[in-house]
Amino acid sequence: MASLPLGPQPHALAPPLQLHDGDALKRRPELDSDKEMSAAVIEGNDAVTGHIISTTIGGKNGEPKQTISYMAERVVGTGSFGIVFQAKCLETGESVAIKKVLQDRRYKNRELQLMRPMDHPNVISLKHCFFSTTSRDELFLNLVMEYVPETLYRVLRHYTSSNQRMPIFYVKLYTYQIFRGLAYIHTVPGVCHRDVKPQNLLVDPLTHQVKLCDFGSAKVLVKGEPNISYICSRYYRAPELIFGATEYTASIDIWSAGCVLAELLLGQPLFPGENSVDQLVEIIKVLGTPTREEIRCMNPNYTDFRFPQIKAHPWHKVFHKRMPPEAIDLASRLLQYSPSLRCTALEACAHPFFNELREPNARLPNGRPLPPLFNFKQELGGASMELINRLIPEHVRRQMSTGLQNS
């Protein structure tokens, strides 16, 4: 297997920004001409913790201008993109997360353009943005987002560190919301996230609401236009990406979400490859050697390549004996070699594995109500009535019709 010509195998985390990736950063003639980003450029923003940042928002369409000040409290994430820090709004006391990224003055930031119109309970919301400069005259874009204190990665680690499995109810609740967020971004703005993993899934520990975050690798995929294949963190990377496909679809996110589901069920990554070639080996050990047709669906250039013939490992043997059969069935529908055979995010939401969440008396284990799960809007646009009826429980439909009559 080591001779597979699968391209470079650097770090587990693919670089979030590739300038040769289509329109990774859209060309902009003049930075200051973007009226929606008319916030003042803040100077002297070298320090983070304890630093106070003041910026002006509003002032469009006759709105009054408003000064908002943030006190930077602590760094919560770092990467090749820059840093994310928690801050407190001094005017309201509200906690926010600010992602600070180095900005090329010649381009628009794609993450900002994609996040602006997004509005969904399971997607992190962008409050506003502003620019800041350092003493070295570097320009930074600051994305101000809602602050959610936990990640799915840390929640899972809480269980595994004490040799426990995540309760199956929480596996259902968290993965359902992941698919609901993906259903929204895939259908409404038409965005592929391209880096779905536990670290990019935020969890509110009180409400157990899940939010998809970090759109630094995200892109609107246009049919016929090539994209980079070296994308997505390794353990969650779809096989067509490992095969070097450049005309992939949003089904790469479905594969990643399937890997997250399996990880929550197992307590560890399903495909823990040490490099790109080993990643494919780990997948083949479970799914077996792909057929010629499956290889053609992933990347037609590989159909004549000879792979060692390995039989698929039965899914029920991948998981422990007491695993609900619905969980195994869902994992098998998500983790398919052929991208077109993977179920869509909406179809995943309707899967029987999540039926417990649709019960009229469904509650959190502590008796509190569930986070919003059925307030679908635009993402149902292309769905069949049969699918909609499976997605929205009868008791919710009755409430909706009663509400409409009363209004």
Curated annotation (Swiss-Prot):
Alphabetized UniProt keyword annotations: Acetylation, ATP-binding, Kinase, Nucleotide-binding, Phosphoprotein, Serine/threonine-protein kinase, Transferase
SUPFAM superfamilies (alphabetical): Protein kinase-like (PK-like)
Keyword Transmembrane (UniProt): no
Residues noted as binding ATP in the record, renumbered to the chain: V76, G77, T78, G79, S80, F81, G82, I83, V84, K99
Single biological process term from Gene Ontology: brassinosteroid mediated signaling pathway
Ranges for region Disordered: 1-23
InterPro entries: GSK-3, Kinase-like_dom_sf, Prot_kinase_dom, Protein_kinase_ATP_BS, Ser/Thr_kinase_AS, STKc_GSK3
Catalytic reaction annotation: L-seryl-[protein] + ATP = O-phospho-L-seryl-[protein] + ADP + H(+); L-threonyl-[protein] + ATP = O-phospho-L-threonyl-[protein] + ADP + H(+)
Domain Protein kinase: 70-354
Catalytic residues in the record: D195
EC number: 2.7.11.1
Annotated Low complexity bias: 1-19
GO MF entry, a single one: ATP binding
Function statement: Phosphorylates BSK1, BSK3, BSK5, BSK6, BSK8 and BSK11 in vitro. May mediate extracellular signals to regulate transcription in differentiating cells.
Family: Belongs to the protein kinase superfamily. CMGC Ser/Thr protein kinase family. GSK-3 subfamily.
Name of the featured protein: Shaggy-related protein kinase iota
Gene: ASK9
